[in-house]
């Protein structure tokens, strides 16, 4: 792995630290490497949760590396199989990802965080999509994912003017899950990751699958869809060993031992 990415395995939790001075900006090469990391995480049966963060205390990521852009890297360059930053276009990742946002998350950096399932941010974090001021658009998920979270008026202001949103405002709008001090950020993200590990892996996979496939459906149609047998994880979890283990462990007043089958 390159010097730009530091990987740490803590049991079933993978920590990924983006380290590209000065702003943790991402060029196509780094994006490819991040994609390899996330795809390996997806396919590794021993890993359950990933945490992505940035090195330092100022930048989570400034997004696309404008120095690379100035040197000829195109906005529509090939950023790898996972899309920009390796995660924004992985649509079959049924394991949770936590973005531990340690500072500015601008442009593609914000889009990377939005592609995660949870955002825990430091109180000095700030979020923005300034692409329109650079003559481009936030097409690595920002213009697609943010409208699913925020009202149109707020989205329009952010994507058309590049307005920044601070940590507390992001919490009020439900963009982030938690706001903590910089010193507590990684411990808090790890605590959340462990809570996820404590849940059954097949259940987590089924939940992500259901969210992904039914989010645009009316409730009645979604009911029919999930019961039609076309989903991979949902039918499996209903007849799994874990579905037996959970109630049994509860009755026996012990922690469940998940097998993922």
Curated annotation (Swiss-Prot):
The active site is at 111 (nucleophile), 131 (proton acceptor). Keywords: Lyase. Its EC number is 4.2.1.149. Signal peptide: none annotated. Pathway: Amine and polyamine metabolism; carnitine metabolism. It catalyses: (R)-carnitinyl-CoA = crotonobetainyl-CoA + H2O. GO terms for biological process: carnitine metabolic process; fatty acid beta-oxidation. SUPFAM superfamilies: ClpP/crotonase (SSF52096). GO terms for molecular function: hydro-lyase activity; L-carnitine CoA-transferase activity. It holds the Pfam family ECH_1. It is an enzyme of class 4 (lyase). Catalyzes the reversible dehydration of L-carnitinyl-CoA to crotonobetainyl-CoA. This is Carnitinyl-CoA dehydratase. It comes from Escherichia coli O6:H1 (strain CFT073 / ATCC 700928 / UPEC). The gene is caiD.
């Amino acid at each position: 792995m390159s010097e730009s990415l530091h990987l740490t395995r803590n049991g079933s939790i993978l920590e990924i630290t983006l380290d590209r001075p000065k702003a943790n900006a991402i060029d196509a090469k780094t994006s490819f490497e991040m994609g390899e990391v996330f795809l390996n995480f997806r396919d590794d049966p021993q890993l359950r949760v990933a945490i992505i963060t940035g090195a330092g205390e100022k930048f989570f990521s400034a997004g696309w590396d404008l120095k690379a852009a100035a040197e000829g890297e195109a906005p529509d360059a090939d950023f790898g199989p996972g899309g920009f930053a390796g995660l924004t276009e992985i649509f079959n990742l049924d394991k949770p990802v936590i973005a531990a946002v340690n500072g500015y998350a601008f442009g593609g950096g914000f889009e990377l965080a939005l592609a995660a399932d949870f955002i825990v941010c430091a109180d000095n974090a700030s979020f923005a999509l300034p692409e329109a001021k650079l003559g481009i658009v936030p097409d690595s998920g920002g213009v697609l994912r943010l409208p699913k979270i925020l009202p149109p008026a707020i989205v329009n202001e952010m994507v058309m003017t590049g307005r920044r949103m601070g940590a507390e405002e992001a919490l009020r709008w439900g963009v982030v899950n938690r706001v903590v001090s910089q010193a507590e950020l990684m411990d808090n993200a790890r605590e959340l990751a462990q809570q996820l590990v404590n849940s059954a892996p097949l259940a987590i996979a089924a939940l992500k699958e259901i969210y992904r496939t039914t989010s645009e459906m009316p409730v009645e149609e979604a009911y029919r869809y999930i019961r039609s047998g076309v989903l991979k994880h949902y039918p499996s979890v209903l007849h799994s060993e874990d579905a037996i283990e959970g109630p049994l462990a509860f009755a026996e007043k012990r922690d469940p031992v998940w097998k993922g089958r």
